[in-house]
Amino acid sequence: MLEGAVTHITEADIVLRIILATVLSSVVGIEREYHQKPAGLRTNVMVGLGSCLFTLVSIRAADIFPDMKAIDPTRIAAQIVTGIGFLGAGTILFEKDRSSVIGLTTAATLWVVAAVGTAIGMGLYLEAIVGTLMVFFTFLVLSKVVNEVRKRSTDHASHGDTAMEANK
């Protein structure tokens, strides 16, 4: 149990958290849907919303059962991480020739959306909003960096020994 933690939240807080979890996970889902990724809008919303609801239920359990000293809201959060790990694992696939793996970003995105939903469920709005912004930074900015690195790597590899000899 979290010693000294205030677990009582109002119905207005609950509604706000559910709506915010839906909105933030929708923002990520729309970006994924736009790029035609396997886990799009609905999947991301379900993961974010579900994580928020599981977190709210665990927090509210302390209000509903005040005499139970062993209720610890963080236990549900730990199980969310495990559950999303299984869901994410289902999105990771080997290419037919087994030369590469696909779906890692999709799995990681679901994991982060679950973290955002859990943070909102706990009332950690700043963390959830900044986390969502960092997802967008990753998709919009870092993906361009990755593409540039891959392009340069391919250019370098295509020159083979000629490039190596030029550097001698």
Region locations from a protein language model:
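Hydrophobic, membrane-inserted alpha-helices
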Residues: 87, 109-117
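Alpha-helical transmembrane segments of multi-pass membrane proteins
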Residues: 25, 51, 55, 59, ...
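Transmembrane helix-loop junctions at the membrane interface of multipass transporters and ion channels
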Residues: 114-127
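Residue-level signal for the membrane-embedded core of alpha-helical transmembrane segments
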Residues: 22, 84, 108, 132-133
